[in-house]
Amino acid sequence: MGKLQDGIAIKRINDAITTFKNYKLGELEQGGSMAINTLSNVRAHVGLAWPAILRNCLIHTSSHLGFMKFMIDIATTWKVGAFTLLGSVGDEDPFTDVDLIYTKTCLHLGLKDNDFLQFPEEFAYEANSFLEAQSMNARVDMLTGVHNIEDKYVFRIESISKFLKAYYTASEDVAYLTGFIKPDGSKESILSAELLKAQVTSEVLRVRNLITTKIQQYINLYEDSQLPHFRRAALSYTQDWDVDGGVPAALPQPDTTDDESPVTKPGASAPTVSKGADQPEDEEIIHKKVDASKDAPPKAVSSGNVSARGIPAFLEDDMSEMDAPDGFHDYLTREHENNFDLAQLGLAPSV
């Protein structure tokens, strides 16, 4: 593959960031989605740098919301091969320094190159470990690995569920996540900081709400499915998440939009959420607060935890792989009537 020149490398990461900035929930379900096609193209050309690019997109404020929507889509899709989008292509890393190129790309896009969410150290390691593991374990060889794709689908769903649950726990303290925001004391800097905090808070609350909503919807749809891999995945979610009672949220959640409304089980009521002190504020309120306290020094940020950026990743997967009876081709035959095809699975040979 060889090393990429900076211009080409920046173009690849530019495409990933821009796609996640504009990513909409449900892109994965659309046939011929431009967003999915773009991410697939980037993945095919960045080799082993793919998990590092995804890691940076996870923690940068500009792409965080879109990346998490992408992960939620993969976690709740009926397309059994969609998890391969997390796998890397090839066995080479064409980047000399992914983080440096990512920084250059941010500057090229007019984004701040230090706006990275400050996650607790435990989640930082877990996120790195997860993405590195999926880079290897989410690969599927069309010649030898397709026959047990249904079992791989269940294993990957279980791994993603653990990642989402770790994120859910780590994101309870949004004030800590925004600890990287440190205004210099000027009115403009304080205003910019407050607006960014409001944006991040709103997005994190939305992601938390989407995670529980879409997982609940998946369980409702597939817990009694005739297809065993869907039943197993739904059972795994049921065991990992207290869906019936509503996964306890430490923060208030924003109203959902029409395409993101909660789906509850018959007879079960959705958890009631009231507005509290952590509810995102509108811009007018922020302006008033800044005017009233522009001379106040910025709050101190506690140390001890670090961002996920730059932390060495573990190369272990939390789920083992195993073979299963050959049922994939029969499954494709059954689903062909529903316009189910390999192209829509996201399957691609490892090269």
Swiss-Prot record:
Location within or outside the cell: Virion; Host cytoplasm
Protein's name in the database: Minor outer capsid protein P9
Summary of the function given for this chain in its UniProt record: Minor outer capsid protein.
Keywords: Capsid protein, Host cytoplasm, Outer capsid protein, Virion
Region Disordered: start-end pairs: 245-281, 288-307
Metal-binding among keywords: no
Main location: virion
Start-end of Basic and acidic residues biased regions: 288-297
A Gene Ontology cellular-component term: viral outer capsid
One Pfam family matching this protein: Phyto_Pns9_10
Family: Belongs to the phytoreovirus minor outer capsid protein P9 family.
InterPro entries linked to this entry: Phyto_Pns9_10
